[in-house]
């Protein structure tokens, strides 16, 4: 893991985050020799992650999700694959043939206008700074980490530029005059500290019920859902969210007001010239 980070990992946007997770995983596995690691060993490790016998954060004390464990498997497998490409590893990848958990397409929750009002009011009562983080997420579709890591240099007049993003591309999103002024009224270069547990505490007191694992991401889903329901363009949404693959953005396409209804207007019979429509209806060959 140290060699992977030195030769490759430190160049990645999330390299330090992945390295920290890998170190925790290695310790939980008992720090075996790399040549002794087997798929059987990892299978027992991930079983303990699922049950919560092994956990790295209080929020996962009841057990990590299959999605998280699949991600951890990818991290560790990538260490061997990358070192092999670099000529530093000459043995087989011990996780190469290990199947990941099958993940069903999950429900994507989003907030209604009434729920947004309730959430913002409760956040403001808890801490106005927390409410501002939530507003930034709802106004821009930002990921939670992008919002809480926001710095003064990223905010220009009526615009926020998110940098060091998951997609590795900077993206600039317009914001309202009111939100801009609220952000710029804060002191310091770094505006926020991570208020995840504050947000968790507030959400538990609201009437809002969310699928597991969507606590902060529901804000991003809410932006995307309302964007599409208001007639927004799917390609514009892809750029705003910073998705590399349009398939990620297409998850929201069904929320567009004209989704599928275009089949009624744009099918080949509907687009026939009017005279041909009549002929087609009565079975006459033009």
Question: Across the structure, where does each feature detected by a protein language model lie?
Answer:
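Short, polar N-cap/turn motifs at the start of nucleic acid-interacting alpha helices
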Residues: 153-159, 232-251, 262, 285
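C-terminal secondary-structure termini that scaffold catalytic or DNA-interacting sites
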Residues: 267-286
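Short, basic (Lys/Arg/His-rich) helix/loop patches that form interaction surfaces
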Residues: 32, 121-131, 140, 173, ...
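N-terminal DNA-binding recognition helix of tyrosine site-specific recombinases/integrases
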Residues: 21-24, 32-40, 51-98, 142-145
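A Lys/Arg-rich helix-loop hairpin that forms a DNA/phosphate-binding surface
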Residues: 13, 26-51, 91, 188-193, ...
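Basic, Lys/Arg- and aromatic-enriched nucleic-acid-binding interface segment
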Residues: 62-66, 70, 85-144, 148, ...
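Short, aromatic/basic-rich helix-turn unit that serves as a nucleic-acid recognition element
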Residues: 1-22
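Short, basic/aromatic-rich helical patch in the C-terminal catalytic core of site-specific tyrosine
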Residues: 42, 76, 80, 147, ...
């Amino acid at each position: 893991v140290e060699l992977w980070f030195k030769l490759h990992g430190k160049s990645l946007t999330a390299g330090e985050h992945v390295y920290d997770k890998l170190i925790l995983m290695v310790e939980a596995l008992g720090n075996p020799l790399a040549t002794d690691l087997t798929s059987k060993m990892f299978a027992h490790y991930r079983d303990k992650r699922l049950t919560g016998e092994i956990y790295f954060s209080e929020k996962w004390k009841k057990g990590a999700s299959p999605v998280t464990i699949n991600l951890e498997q990818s991290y560790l497998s990538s260490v061997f694959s990358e070192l092999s490409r670099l000529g530093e590893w000459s043995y087989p990848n011990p996780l190469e043939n290990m199947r990941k958990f099958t993940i069903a397409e999950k429900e994507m929750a989003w907030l209604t206008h009434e729920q947004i009002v309730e959430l913002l009011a409760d956040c403001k009562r808890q801490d106005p700074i927390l409410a501002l983080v939530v507003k930034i997420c709802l106004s821009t579709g930002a990921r939670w980490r992008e919002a809480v890591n926001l710095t003064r240099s990223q905010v220009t007049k009526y615009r926020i530029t998110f940098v060091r993003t998951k997609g590795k591309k900077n993206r600039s999103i317009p914001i309202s005059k009111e939100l801009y002024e609220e952000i710029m009224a804060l002191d310091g270069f770094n505006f926020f500290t991570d208020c995840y547990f504050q947000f968790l505490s507030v959400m538990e007191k609201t009437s809002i019920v969310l699928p597991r694992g969507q606590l902060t991401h529901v804000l991003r889903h809410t932006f995307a859902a309302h964007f599409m329901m208001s007639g927004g363009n799917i390609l514009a949404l892809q750029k705003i969210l910073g998705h590399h693959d349009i398939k990620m953005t297409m998850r929201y396409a069904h929320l567009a007001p004209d989704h599928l209804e275009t089949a009624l207007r744009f099918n080949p019979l509907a687009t026939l010239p009017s005279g041909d429509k009549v002929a087609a209806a009565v079975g006459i060959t033009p």
